């Protein structure tokens, strides 16, 4: 019986070692991917800073102007859609306003 116990213990330890090795490799792979993502984010941030520096504008001023332009763009189509949606969504109301019964 002692031989079987020794063999079983050796098999378990080999399995355990393999599992641990796999886990270590997985962790190393995750760390490498995270490192790559961080590097990409840092590189992207550096490129943005370079672009704004080339424009000669402060970040604050440019952002405010961009926000104003976006708001103006958003307001136009939203108002049109709202009026169209009201006309389509409430046909009974149109009929009563036009003199027809609902």
From Swiss-Prot:
Q: What is this protein called?
A: Parathymosin
What this protein is reported to do is described as: Parathymosin may mediate immune function by blocking the effect of prothymosin alpha which confers resistance to certain opportunistic infections.
Q: Which organism is it from?
A: Rattus norvegicus
Positions carrying N6-acetyllysine are: 4, 15, 92
Acidic residues composition bias: residue spans: 38-75
GO cellular component, alphabetical, reads: nucleus
Give the modified residues of type Phosphoserine. Answer: 2, 5, 13
| Modification N-acetylserine, positions | 2
Q: Which key words tag this protein in UniProt?
A: Acetylation, Immunity, Phosphoprotein, Zinc
Task: Provide the family line.
Answer: Belongs to the pro/parathymosin family.
């Amino acid at each position: 019986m002692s031989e079987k116990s020794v063999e079983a213990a050796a098999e378990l330890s080999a399995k355990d070692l393999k599992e641990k090795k796999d886990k270590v490799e997985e962790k190393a792979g995750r760390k490498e991917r995270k490192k790559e993502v961080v590097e990409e984010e840092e590189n992207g941030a550096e490129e943005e800073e370079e672009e704004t520096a080339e424009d000669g504008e402060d970040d604050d001023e440019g952002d405010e102007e961009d926000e104003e332009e976006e708001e103006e763009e958003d307001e136009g189509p939203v108002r049109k859609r709202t009026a169209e949606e009201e006309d389509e969504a409430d046909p009974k109301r149109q009929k009563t306003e036009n003199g027809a019964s609902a």
